[in-house]
A protein has these predicted regions:
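A structured, charge-rich N-terminal accessory region that forms the first stable segment of a protein
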Residues: 10-103
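Conserved catalytic cores of phosphodiester-cleaving nucleases, focusing on short active-site segments
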Residues: 135, 163-165, 174-182
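Acidic, metal/cofactor-coordinating or nucleic-acid-engaging core segments within structured domains
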Residues: 191-278, 282-289
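Extended, charged low-complexity segments
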Residues: 268-357
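Hydrophobic/aromatic-rich core segments of domains that either
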Residues: 142, 167-173
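A short, highly charged nucleic-acid-interacting micro-segment common to nuclease
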Residues: 108-132
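A short, glycine/Asx- and small/polar-enriched loop/turn
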Residues: 156-160
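A short acidic/basic microdomain associated with nuclease active sites
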Residues: 139-155
């Protein structure tokens, strides 16, 4: 559904202004302090997609820092859940009155509590916040619509994308459609993501609705002047089909990896403390070929284009324990839900045979 065409022969001043304006919507993040990337999602001339990155929770010597990751993700909710203008208002209030910190915390927490009360059958917040952080950090794309605040509005549908991010690069606006998954294993998360990608990409009505959300209710209202109008034009796919834009569907899959995490080196004082993290990263990275082949097979199986997909896999010892720690950091009662992909049939040899690339 990406549009071609050209609105200029090269990057003019207006285009550069748009790129700078979108960059101002990026929020600071410390996700790399608790999540390590052992394989980056880079372009590969010998591979037709999807791009895939492998990440994992960092270690504190020999122990995965699961609680630290949970706390960091809850802290990032201050940026993830609040619309840009409300963030700016809280910044001004906090600058003059430190008690506003408590009001900001309560406002974010209330959004999650309200969402849980309205939709007790859904529990996707952890994955959505993780997706927000990683797409900002590793794709350099700013959030252009706060989906959590929209989901708590009475007249807004709860179903839809988990996030929409954008960056102006290589002469075009790149729009990232985000889908997050919490899975018992990487393969199941990939299969669930592929099914969601195909469902969204085949639904023209929902596709247009997501663009309308950005234009009407998103963070672009925090921009000013010509840059704001140019951004709105780029998200108007009906009124301005001639503008350069590309679209990518990003799956962020946080999954349990008990096998690799269960193999630990002996504690040795004659070695640096990070040998445990480096050992895990090496073993996990060895799965890269079969995991991206699985992702390609699943995307093709569901009729999605692997060349327009990006998959980021995030390994933790037990995703249920991470979710439990996230709710504890938030200060709300834990809720138990099935994990994504548990209801799917996965062949035992899915992804076997190595990476043909």
């Amino acid at each position: 559904m990406a549009n071609g065409g050209s609105d200029s022969d090269g990057p003019d001043e207006e285009v550069e202004a748009l790129a700078r304006a979108l960059a101002t919507l990026l929020n600071p993040s410390k996700i790399d302090g608790v999540v390590n990337c052992c394989v980056r999602a880079v372009h590969d001339e010998a591979w037709e997609g999807p791009r895939m990155g492998l990440l994992h929770v960092r270690f504190g010597e020999d122990r995965p820092r699961v609680e630290d990751l949970a706390y960091l993700l809850w802290s990032e909710c201050m940026y993830y859940a609040l619309p840009r203008r409300r963030q700016e208002r809280f910044r001004r209030e906090i600058a003059s009155d430190m008690t506003a910190v408590a009001r900001c915390y309560r406002a974010v927490r209330d959004l999650f509590i309200d969402f849980n009360a309205r939709h007790p059958e859904r529990a996707s917040e952890l994955g959505e916040v993780l997706a927000y952080c990683l797409v900002q950090e590793h794709l350099g794309a700013a959030q252009v619509a706060s989906k959590m605040s929209l989901k708590t509005a009475a007249n807004m549908p709860v179903h839809g994308l988990d996030g929409i991010h954008a960056v102006f690069e290589n002469g075009a606006l790149t729009v990232y459609f985000l889908e997050s998954k919490l899975a018992s294993e990487g393969r199941r998360g990939v299969a669930s993501y592929a099914a969601s990608a195909a469902e969204f990409l085949s639904d023209r009505r929902q596709y247009l609705r997501e663009y309308e959300i950005v234009a009407d209710l998103g963070n672009l209202d925090a921009l000013e002047g010509e840059a704001r109008q140019r951004a709105l034009d780029h998200f108007d796919v009906i009124g301005h089909p001639e503008l350069r834009r590309r679209e990518r569907f990003v799956g962020i899959i946080c999954h349990s990896e008990p096998g690799h995490f269960g193999k630990r080196l002996r504690i040795r004082d004659d070695q640096p403390p990070d040998i445990h993290e480096r050992d895990f990263a090496e073993r996990y990275a060895a799965d890269y070929g079969k995991l991206r082949l699985t992702a390609r097979k699943q995307l093709l199986k569901h009729g999605a284009d692997p060349a327009k997909a990006i998959v980021l896999l995030v390994a933790v010892p037990d995703v249920r324990e991470l979710r439990k720690a996230f709710y504890a950091a938030m200060g709300v009662a834990e809720r138990e839900f099935p994990l994504d992909g548990d209801d799917l049939e996965i062949d035992d040899d899915e992804g076997a045979g190595g990476d043909p690339a």
